[in-house]
Curated annotation (Swiss-Prot):
The active site is at 66 (proton acceptor). It catalyses: Endonucleolytic cleavage of RNA, removing extra 3' nucleotides from tRNA precursor, generating 3' termini of tRNAs. A 3'-hydroxy group is left at the tRNA terminus and a 5'-phosphoryl group is left at the trailer molecule. This is Ribonuclease Z. Its EC number is 3.1.26.11. Pfam families: Lactamase_B (PF00753), Lactamase_B_2 (PF12706). Binds 2 Zn(2+) ions. Gene3D superfamilies: Ribonuclease Z/Hydroxyacylglutathione hydrolase-like (3.60.15.10). Zn(2+) 1 binds at residues 62, 64, 139, 210. Zinc phosphodiesterase, which displays some tRNA 3'-processing endonuclease activity. Probably involved in tRNA maturation, by removing a 3'-trailer from precursor tRNA. Zn(2+) 2 binds at residues 66-67, 210, 268. Homodimer.
Length: 321
């Protein structure tokens, strides 16, 4: 699981930051999921090493323009030359009307099917490898945070141990690799888990924007390996954050701390903190780190491989022993 930030500014783009969009790459299945699609997102694709042909799902947090104005252009371009097979979208109730109106009035005809699902709190998508759930956030319009959970996978299968038990290679190995019980022709019952190493614990990625500090964000983020949370304002502008229902850097850090996440990545920054102003983005970073030390600040085209923190901890423990 790797994320790439395609836009990290709030409201309007700047010379160095486009508006909101994050790509989640699932390389083992050559698939790409997009979270929000602000204006110019397709241009950001062209400036990155992402392949639009791998786009399969788009998750929209809310219907403000800096999160959706890039949708029509991206979907139209996918149809012209992206070789996209189909795209499934998830978002607020107004998303489908917005797309249908755009397609109708621009007389755009997509060369591939799209499906639009209305997001509701709870699980909105699940397959053999991943579960996607969402929760309400607290903003001026209906807004959702999204959580992607990678399912646990069995550990390394010990072929030599299986052979030593007299288990011949064949289709039965597939069940054993999945940690299942199997019955051998001689009547012996074998627990596949006994032939596998420690399981690979699934990673958890959470994306929360736009929102002021709220219980929904804390609950959705519980135990996340990576929380990407908006930090539109500095702590000194907290009054403005409450008025506009956005988060400060300290609110993002408080969510991370309360939810027990491993790593916080802040995004969605107001242009008011650009170089030359009295408060800079580095000040927001220091504010957050005072509460939650493992905090970083996103920037456009930053790619980040979400680590398996339990395996990192095991390696560190071995190195220290």
């Amino acid at each position: 699981m790797q994320i790439t930030f395609l836009g990290t500014s709030s409201g309007v783009p700047t010379r160095s930051r486009n508006v909101s969009s994050i790509a989640l790459r699932l390389p083992q299945r050559a698939e790409l999921w997009l979270f929000d699609c602000g204006e110019g997102t397709q241009h950001q694709f062209l400036r990155s090493d992402l392949k639009v042909s791998q786009l399969s799902r788009i998750f929209i947090t809310h219907m403000h323009g800096d999160h959706v104005f890039g949708l029509m252009g991206l979907l139209a371009s996918c149809g012209l030359g992206g070789n996209v097979k189909s795209v499934t979208l998830y978002g607020p109730p107004a998303l489908e009307d917005y797309l249908q109106a755009g397609l109708r009035y621009s007389q755009t005809h997509l060369a591939y099917p799209i499906k639009v699902h209305k997001s509701k709190p709870g699980v909105i998508y699940e397959d053999d490898e991943y579960v996607v759930s969402c929760a309400y956030l607290k903003h001026r319009v209906t807004a959702f945070g999204y959580r992607v959970t990678e399912k646990d996978r069995p550990g390394h299968f010990n072929v030599e141990k299986a052979k030593a038990l007299g288990i011949p290679p064949g289709p039965i190995y597939r069940k054993l690799k999945q940690g299942e019980f199997v019955t051998l022709p001689d009547g012996r019952k074998i627990n596949g888990a006994d032939l596998c190493g420690a399981p690979h614990v699934g990673r958890k990625f959470v994306y929360c924007t736009d929102t002021v500090f709220c219980d929904g964000a804390v609950e959705l983020s519980q135990g996340a390996d990576l929380l990407v949370h908006e930090a539109t304002f500095s702590h000194q502008d907290a009054e403005m954050a409450f008025q506009r229902l956005h988060s400060t850097s300290t609110m993002a850090a408080q969510v991370a701390l309360a939810a027990g996440v491993k790593h916080l990545m802040m995004t969605h920054f107001s242009p008011r903190y650009a170089p030359g102003n009295s408060v800079l983005l580095d000040d927001l970073l220091q504010e957050a780190r005072a509460i939650f030390p493992n905090t970083d600040m996103a920037y456009d085209f930053l790619s980040y491989e979400i680590p398996r923190w339990n395996e990192v901890s095991q390696l560190l423990a071995k190195a220290r022993s």
